[in-house]
Amino acid sequence: MKKLLLLTALASVISVSASAAEKLIVAATPIPHAEILELIKPTLAKEGVDLQIKVFTDYVQPNVQVAEKRLDANFFQHQPYLDEFNKAKGTDLVAVTGVHIEPLGAYSSKYKKLDELPSGATVVIPNDATNGGRALLLLDKAGVIKL
């Protein structure tokens, strides 16, 4: 299903980008976005598109580089993040299509469950407004914090 959705999304990008060149440079986060792109790379090659994947662990640079036309597209973000980025950076990037929303995970070498966290424990959340807000809502729903 993800492969079909991504092929559809990339078809739109390709119709704009590949008409000028057969090379399509797309930024992606390592997991799962770059992995998904790797899956469709052979299919795109059959269509004459040389998909080049640039992997980023930073959520800012993919948008900056698309805005500066150093990359053709990126694949990693949901619409609220893109909207916040455009507002903060004064860019006008647009989504070709929506993407799936990744689940948030909680990881600890000390605790196996959220209910094991002691009162006053330190919890790290994403540093961007959209994902940070999402993390706070999930922690509230799990009873870890009270909003």
Set out the residue ranges of the language-model regions.
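Short helix-initiation/N-cap motifs at beta->coil->alpha
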Residues: I53-V64
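Short, well-ordered beta-strand elements
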Residues: A21-I31, L51-V55, T122-V123
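Gram-negative bacterial Sec-dependent N-terminal signal peptides
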Residues: M1-A20
